[in-house]
Amino acid sequence: FGLQITPMRPLVRNRRLWRPWSAVNLWFPWEKIHNVPDARFAKDNYPAMRKSFSSDGSIPLFHYFAGFSASPENPGYPQHANEWSITPPPAGTEVSPNDREWRYVFMCAGSRSYRDYYLRSMSRCMRELKMQELYFDNCWSWFCGNEAHGCGWTDEHGKKYCTANILGSRELAKNIYREHRRQYPYGLIVRHISQIPEPPLISFCDALVDGECFMLDVGRDESYYNVFRPDFFRASFRGEQFGMPSVFIPQFERAYQLHFPEKLKDSKAGKLPGQEKHMRHFIGYILAHDTHAWPNFGVSVSKYLKIMDNAGITDDSAFYGYWQPDSPVRTAGTLSDRIMASAYAADNGALVILMNDTDQPADVLLSLDSKVFGNSPALSDAESGKTLSGTAVSVPARDFRMIRIIKK
């Protein structure tokens, strides 16, 4: 099942033109230490890094921050550690203690003192460094039992319990959003929350980054065959039901780096068995659901986005998902629900993404609405440019076809 936020706001403009790394940079690690919003901690080469990461200032650049994690080098931490900390674990427990840039302790947004401190620092930092776009990592709610700031409770037998800091996390997210919009009315905020779409938090951002929950599965199987299902993907990774686009981080090479190092060299050389097919299966799901892939860890989508650009697909182009009964492009006959035909309205016709998520090749007959495409539209393979002789299309197992339809 999926959550539905109502009312839904429109998706941000130009989101189909987002090209991570070339038209937008969603991730800019700008600090010497982790998540302390203070210009004094900018890296020594910050001006040069900012120029490079933003293509000389020509594309939006999202400065990296976080939620519940922050460096113990935060100037206010030594004095307020006991009040600000999430407990358990004990206050002062560090993650990655030997890596200065990424070492952190656990901070609780349930602490009003911490929220006020963070917001004051963030307001000043955004203004001083002109941060028009922000990226927040580690920003879902946590359970906390720290009574020093009001979390936790004790039952009649004296047993202590944690409480979820949802309201404090919402308050911090809301106030950051308001202050950011006050300074930069047309700026954007991205939150990276994999598979925890908390409406109280994601209501205060413009896009979601997801996909980090499947590292071991993908590393073991070298594919998303056992992860993706049409209904699961539709409910989890489209973002439309939350009023914001979702960007999926593929885990191929990242999984190999962290858990299966013996596979990394072959992956980078493109020599893993079935590697190209596994990549196309992943990309097919992205395209068939009108969502976004983070082009990293072995995945490139540039070729397919160029095809969409050449077809004239923009933010204003209608999208017809395979699940929508009013789509002008349907599959004829009774087929597996793992065979999907989605369509984007394009110049003088449509671009169809025909996805076959089964283990067998599929011969699919497309049923086209004559009121939209006329009685004898021209069909071609958008990747090869070859003309099709009719509306019957063969799709390899665990693969997709991009079919261009021209109205006649």
What are the language-model segments listed below?
Residues 118-152:
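Active-site groove signature of glycoside hydrolases
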Residues 24-43, 99-119, 155-169, 270:
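The substrate-binding groove and active-site-proximal loops of carbohydrate-active enzymes
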Residues 389-408:
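C-terminal beta-strand-rich structural cap/linker in extracellular carbohydrate-active enzymes
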Residues 165-374, 378, 383:
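Active-site-proximal substrate-binding groove within the catalytic cores of carbohydrate-active enzymes
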Residues 23-27, 136, 145, 191, ...:
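Conserved beta-strand positions
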Residues 47-129:
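Active-site-adjacent "subsite" loops/lids of carbohydrate-active enzymes
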Residues 1-68, 133, 286, 296-307, ...:
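Carbohydrate-recognition beta-sandwich/jelly-roll modules
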Residues 7-16, 114-127, 279:
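Short, acidic/polar
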